[in-house]
């Protein structure tokens, strides 16, 4: 028989419920313990029994006297408990069991629970107000979400009143609100042509425009200023680029003056009486040679245009001449429809009546537009001369 405890049992497994304050008895072993270890265990058990007795009685008193949900009384009671514990457990500080007694006491568990309840019930309201949900955050930096919210709210209001959509109200919402949609990235994606200089000018990126214009020569600047009014404004606001443009214009004028120096004397000599007829003949021969060279250049350019457009045709398409500008047009024989490929024209016409394409409707009864040479000969032409000879 072991006396009180076994050698393998640790002192932490003791519970205050199994021991009572009034009936505390140790089991006496009938066999004498000759070894000093067993005798030390008996002394150790006696210390623990007395300590547990004191903690149980103190825990019961605190349960009866402890007020509920009162912070000031709790703090006052905690102070009293600390003084009592220092006085009562002063003799057990050297034994090493005072920490076990403080941790296992039921009084401390109850006080901790009461303090936690008070802290949960008395949470400050300001802290709860500052905790805003995520959906109430500002959307100033999110223009697409702002526009979406505005459109959804207007459509809901319209749905309540009538099932039809009032597009005028939708246009008012789109035009009236400053959502900042112009600053969205990727809104111009998919476009074949895009005016980068105009966009930079509208967004007031002057430093980028100056960097771009510095890389252009004088001839390039002359071409830039003749593109559009916005490009002209861009060039006029940049002083260095505008000055280089002026210098380029002066150089061009000087070159033209040098080229036309020999023709100027000839023009002045036309008013002279002697050798005037000879000079007129020479001038006319030069003009005819220039016209012929220009016509050859135009024909070569048109031939190149038709070849370029022919490379982009589909299997069921062919080429035709535009009715308005005589440029290459893509012709669909199944629909009898042709569209001009020139950017400034892009005339979509019916090949049967040479009018604007009318879809499945019948062609107009009026005569088609004829862009051929009129029946009457022009004055000075071969036909007119022949007619005069006949007369």
Swiss-Prot record:
Please give the GO cellular component terms listed in this UniProt entry: centrosome; cytoplasm; nucleus; spindle
Q: Where are the zinc fingers (ZBR-type)?
A: 318-366
UniProt entry tagged with the keyword Iron: no
Could you tell me which residue ranges the F-box domain spans? Answer: 198-245
Query: Which PROSITE patterns does the entry mention?
Result: ZF_ZBR
Stored Pfam families: F-box
Q: Which residues bind Zn(2+) 1?
A: 322, 325, 340, 345
Ranges in coiled-coil conformation? none
Print the keywords alphabetically.
Cell cycle, Cell division, Cytoplasm, Cytoskeleton, Metal-binding, Mitosis, Nucleus, Ubl conjugation pathway, Zinc, Zinc-finger
Compartments (UniProt record): Nucleus; Cytoplasm; Cytoplasm, Cytoskeleton, Spindle; Cytoplasm, Cytoskeleton, Microtubule organizing center, Centrosome
The pathway to which it is assigned is: Protein modification; protein ubiquitination
Tell me the SUPFAM superfamilies matching this sequence. F-box domain
Q: Where is this region: Disordered?
A: 365-391
Summarizing the function annotation, the protein's role is: Regulates progression through early mitosis by inhibiting the anaphase promoting complex/cyclosome (APC). Binds to the APC activators cdc20 to prevent APC activation. Can also bind directly to the APC to inhibit substrate-binding. Required to arrest unfertilized eggs at metaphase of meiosis II, by preventing their release from metaphase of meiosis II, through inhibition of APC-dependent cyclin B destruction leading to stabilization of cyclin B-cdk1 complex activity.
User: How the protein assembles, per its UniProt entry?
Assistant: Part of a SCF (SKP1-cullin-F-box) protein ligase complex. Interacts with btrc. Interacts with skp1. Interacts with cdc20. Interacts with pin1; stabilizes fbxo5 by preventing its association with btrc in an isomerization-dependent pathway; this interaction is present during G2 phase and prevents fbxo5 degradation. Interacts with plk1.
The name this protein goes by in its record: F-box only protein 5
Organism (species):
Xenopus tropicalis
Lineage, please? Answer: Eukaryota, Metazoa, Chordata, Craniata, Vertebrata
């Amino acid at each position: 028989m072991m006396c009180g405890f076994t050698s393998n049992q640790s002192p932490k497994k003791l519970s205050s419920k199994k021991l009572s304050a009034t009936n505390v008895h140790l089991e006496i072993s009938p066999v004498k313990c000759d070894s000093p270890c067993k005798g030390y265990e008996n002394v150790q058990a006696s210390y623990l029994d007395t300590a547990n007795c004191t903690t149980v009685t103190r825990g019961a008193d605190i349960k009866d006297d402890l007020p509920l949900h009162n912070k000031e009384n709790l703090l006052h009671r905690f102070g009293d408990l600390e003084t009592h514990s220092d006085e009562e457990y002063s003799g057990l500080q050297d034994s090493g069991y005072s920490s076990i007694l403080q941790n296992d006491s039921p009084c401390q568990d109850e006080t901790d629970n009461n303090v936690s309840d008070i802290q949960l019930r008395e949470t400050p309201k300001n802290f709860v107000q500052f905790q805003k949900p995520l959906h109430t955050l500002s959307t100033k930096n999110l223009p697409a979400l702002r526009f979406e919210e505005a459109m959804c709210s207007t459509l809901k209001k319209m749905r309540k009143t009538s099932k039809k959509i009032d597009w005028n109200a939708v246009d008012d919402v789109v035009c009236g609100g400053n959502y900042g949609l112009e600053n969205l990235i990727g809104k111009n994606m998919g476009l074949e042509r895009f005016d980068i200089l105009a966009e930079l000018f509208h967004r007031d990126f002057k430093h980028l425009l100056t960097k771009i214009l510095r890389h252009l020569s004088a001839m390039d600047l002359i071409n830039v200023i003749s593109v559009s009014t916005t490009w002209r404004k861009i060039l006029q606001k940049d002083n260095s680029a505008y000055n280089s443009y002026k210098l380029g214009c002066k150089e061009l004028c000087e070159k033209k003056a040098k080229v036309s120096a020999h023709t100027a004397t000839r023009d002045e000599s036309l008013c002279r009486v002697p050798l005037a007829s000879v000079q007129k003949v020479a001038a006319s021969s030069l003009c005819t040679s220039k016209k012929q060279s220009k016509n050859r250049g135009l024909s070569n350019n048109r031939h190149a245009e038709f070849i370029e457009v022919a490379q982009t045709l589909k299997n069921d398409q062919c080429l035709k001449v535009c009715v308005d500008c005589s440029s290459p047009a893509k012709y669909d024989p199944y629909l009898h429809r042709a569209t001009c490929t020139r950017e400034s024209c892009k005339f979509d016409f019916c090949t049967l009546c040479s009018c604007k394409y009318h879809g499945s409707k019948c062609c107009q009864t009026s005569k088609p537009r004829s862009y051929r040479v009129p029946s009457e000969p022009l004055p000075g032409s071969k036909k007119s001369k022949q007619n005069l000879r006949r007369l």
